[in-house]
């Protein structure tokens, strides 16, 4: 029957006497050999050289300064922009430019002061709303 092809033999549906063994006489020992995994080792100097996130402070004076702010955002740096030294119309144009830039990179822009804005790339998370805190502090100072 060794020369014939049988589906039941192929799928192991028949019992073969050739494979019966005495399990009591055999001993199996599983030796665990210590293995070193060099791919799990991290150098302490490499961990210390991790790239840190930066926050850049900008105070634009002309519209072309908005390009510098946009470059910082493209380099994944958060930017705090102070508009106290620029005219209202120019500040509005810069805010429009930065809003478009932040939208294009999936970042966020948030007003944190009267003329101060925080622009962040997508690897930053802005938590909370500063205007609510400012309003609450103004209310507390009026009560006291």
UniProtKB/Swiss-Prot annotation:
Residues 21-38 have a biased composition (Polar residues). It is found in: Cytoplasm. Its main location: cytoplasm. Keywords: Cell cycle, Cell division, Cytoplasm, Septation. GO terms for cellular component: cytoplasm. Residues 21-40 are annotated as: Disordered. PANTHER family: CELL DIVISION PROTEIN SEPF (PTHR35798:SF1). Homodimer. Interacts with FtsZ. Cell division protein that is part of the divisome complex and is recruited early to the Z-ring. Probably stimulates Z-ring formation, perhaps through the cross-linking of FtsZ protofilaments. Its function overlaps with FtsA. This is Cell division protein SepF. It comes from Latilactobacillus sakei subsp. sakei (strain 23K).
């Amino acid at each position: 029957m060794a020369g014939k092809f049988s589906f039941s033999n192929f799928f192991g549906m028949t019992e073969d006497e050739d494979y019966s063994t005495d399990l009591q006489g055999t001993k199996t020992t599983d030796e665990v050999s210590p293995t070193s995994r060099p791919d799990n080792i991290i150098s302490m100097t490499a961990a210390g050289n991790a790239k840190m996130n930066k926050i850049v402070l900008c105070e634009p004076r002309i519209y072309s300064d908005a390009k510098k702010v946009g470059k910082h955002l493209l380099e994944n740096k958060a930017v705090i922009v102070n508009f106290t030294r620029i005219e209202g119309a120019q500040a509005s144009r810069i805010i429009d430019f930065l809003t478009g830039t932040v939208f294009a990179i999936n970042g966020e822009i948030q007003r944190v002061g009267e003329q101060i804005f925080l622009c962040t790339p997508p690897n930053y998370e802005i938590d909370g709303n500063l205007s609510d805190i400012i309003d609450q502090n103004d209310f507390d100072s009026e009560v006291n």
